[in-house]
């Protein structure tokens, strides 16, 4: 009867470990799995799908927060507000393409002045000024 019986130290119950901590994630794998099942996206949901989706969502959130934090620091602020998220997303090419149709509430608009509305250069070109003297 090899293999039967209690192993040494098996008296202590195993501590429960969440799927998020097993995967080394902060986002809730169990909750995402529940949403995937309740959403009827498919008849069945694989065990790895919610882990992968949680990792992707966590990465995107970290990316946006890092860029928004940089935007807040550039504006000499210590708190991230929707304006900083808007500036971060719209200044990043890939995030802007991903969230192109998304409206960020209280985000404002991107600063942009059309070139025709900008004042003319005061100095101009030296050749043009010299050419006018000959006439």
Curated annotation (Swiss-Prot):
Pfam families reported in the protein's UniProt record: Histone (PF00125), Histone_H2A_C (PF16211)
Q: Which GO terms describe its cellular component?
A: nucleosome; nucleus
Q: Does the entry feature the keyword Lipid biosynthesis, yes or no?
A: no
Organism superkingdom: Eukaryota
Q: From the Swiss-Prot or TrEMBL record, what is one GO molecular function term?
A: structural constituent of chromatin
SMART domains reported in the protein's UniProt record: H2A
**UniProt keyword annotations, A-Z:** Chromosome, DNA-binding, Nucleosome core, Nucleus
Cite the Gene3D superfamilies for this sequence: Histone, subunit A
Q: Name one GO biological process term.
A: heterochromatin formation
Principal localization?
nucleus
Subcellular localization? Nucleus; Chromosome
Q: Does the keyword Flavoprotein apply?
A: no
Under the heading InterPro entries, the entry gives: Histone-fold, Histone_H2A, Histone_H2A/H2B/H3, Histone_H2A_C, Histone_H2A_CS
CDD domains for the chain? HFD_H2A
The entry describes its oligomerization and partners as: The nucleosome is a histone octamer containing two molecules each of H2A, H2B, H3 and H4 assembled in one H3-H4 heterotetramer and two H2A-H2B heterodimers. The octamer wraps approximately 147 bp of DNA.
Family that this chain belongs to: Belongs to the histone H2A family.
Give the function comment from the record. Answer: Core component of nucleosome. Nucleosomes wrap and compact DNA into chromatin, limiting DNA accessibility to the cellular machineries which require DNA as a template. Histones thereby play a central role in transcription regulation, DNA repair, DNA replication and chromosomal stability. DNA accessibility is regulated via a complex set of post-translational modifications of histones, also called histone code, and nucleosome remodeling.
* Stated name of the protein: Probable histone H2A.2
Source species of the chain: Oryza sativa subsp. japonica
Highest classification ranks of the organism: Eukaryota, Viridiplantae, Streptophyta, Embryophyta, Tracheophyta
